[in-house]
């Protein structure tokens, strides 16, 4: 019954079905190979990077992370206790450093107090509750919360970012406006696939790498997806 309702909803709104998502993942994985996402030495580095990458290039994030490492400060207890002015100085290359410093410290304190500074500390928290808690922290929006869910806490989720929006729109599917609506519409479909956490991590990386390489519809049409996927339409 649930599958029938989902199929009818997909047809009405022209959303992809789970099999289409899996086919897309396999095609992209075969063409682009392992992406290695998320690039980091520790899960906490992923957490901080997910905040710093908001509205900036990754090269700027790398500079900020390098500065934190040079201070031996890329550790949750250290960042939770650091003087805000010092943290702002270290992450200045990432831009919006005042607000980002508040977010980094809010997230660090939550991670220490709620999770014991380890991903395993959140094991007893349900997916819905964990996402709600992350969204309740200063400066954490939907995309950042889903990045953390997927890459830090190893929860199956769909990162409905700009690159995903552009890709599915190019493939002829309806894409609801705004991150919350897009995530809400596509998450049930993505989570109905057989893709594992690791697959979904890689899928997000593949989507973003594809989006960076093929920035507009003309370029996408000439890519490996242009012929093989657009011929299938919204199956």
Label each region the model flagged.
Residues 10-234:
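Catalytic cores of DNA base-excision repair glycosylases
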